[in-house]
Amino acid sequence: MHRRDVVRPVALVAAVMALAGCGGGADQTATPQAPSGPADGGLEHIHGLGVSGETLFIATHTGLWTAPRGDVQARRFGSSRQDIMGFSVLREGRFVGSGHPDPSQTDQPPNLGLIESRDGGRSWRSVSLRGDADFHVLQSAGNSVYGVNSANGQIMASSDAGRSWQRHKPPAGVFSLAIDPRAGKRILVSTERGVFASQNGGEQWRPLRTRLAGLLAWPAGGRLYLLGGDGAVQMSADGGQTWKPTGAIGGEPTAFMAHGADLYAALSDNTVKRSADGGRTWTLRAAP
C-alpha cells in the first residue's frame, strides 16, 4: 500500500495539536460491473465521500463502496480495486476522482490524474493530467473543480470540469478545501498554518483570524463547518472569520463533506456518520 495513504489522519491530528499550542484523453481506467454483494472485509482507508441520488458513495484505498438510503451496510461497487485518493460528485451520476490504478492494471501510470465517471461509478475514464497529478484533496461545484496535487503541493483550479487547469501556490501545506456554494471563485483551505481564504480561485490568499485546522465542509445553507483531528466540529456563520463548537463525531476523521443540509464524516474505523442538525448529533450511516 502507499504509506502516505494511511498517515494523513495522523498528520491532521498532529497539526491540530501544534496549532492549539500556538494559540486530456479518454482512456478507460476501470470498468466495474453492477454493485455486488455485502462487504467482503476490504473496506479500508476512506479518502472521500459523496451522495448521488439517495446513495452514499465511499471512495477508499480499495475502490468504490456504496450504502443506499436506509442501509448501513457498505457494499463494494463493482470489481475495481483502484485507490481513489480524491473523490467528488459533480452532479447526480457524474463523479470525478484521482489516485492510483487497480494493481492488476499494470499498463497504467502510478498517478491517474483526473478521472471521471458519467454512469454513477460503473466506469471511469481519464480526463486530464494522466501520469502527472495525484489529487489527495478534490472538490467540485458545478463545472468548477479544485484539487491539491500531492506530487508538488500545488492548488489546481478548473472551470471546465477538469479539461484545463490553472496552477496556484498554496499559502501552506493544505489538508482540506471548501468551495463557497454561492460563489465558485471563493474558496477556503485548511492548512498547517490555519485557515486561508481566496476570492479569486486560489490566485491570492489571506489568513482568517483562527488557528484552527481540520477538514472543511460548506453546505448550501451558507454555514461553514470544520472537523478537527480530535473529532470536534466547529461552525462559522461568517465565512470562517469566527467559529463556535457544535458537537463531536466521537472518533478520528478521515473525510468530511456536505450534501444539502446534511454533514457526513468518515472515521478511522471505516464507519461513516451523518448529522442532520449542523453537527450537534451524529448517527451511523455506513459501516463495513
Give the residues covered by each predicted segment.
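Short coil/turn segments at the loop-to-beta-strand junctions that recur within blades
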Residues: 80-85, 130-135, 170-176, 210-215, ...
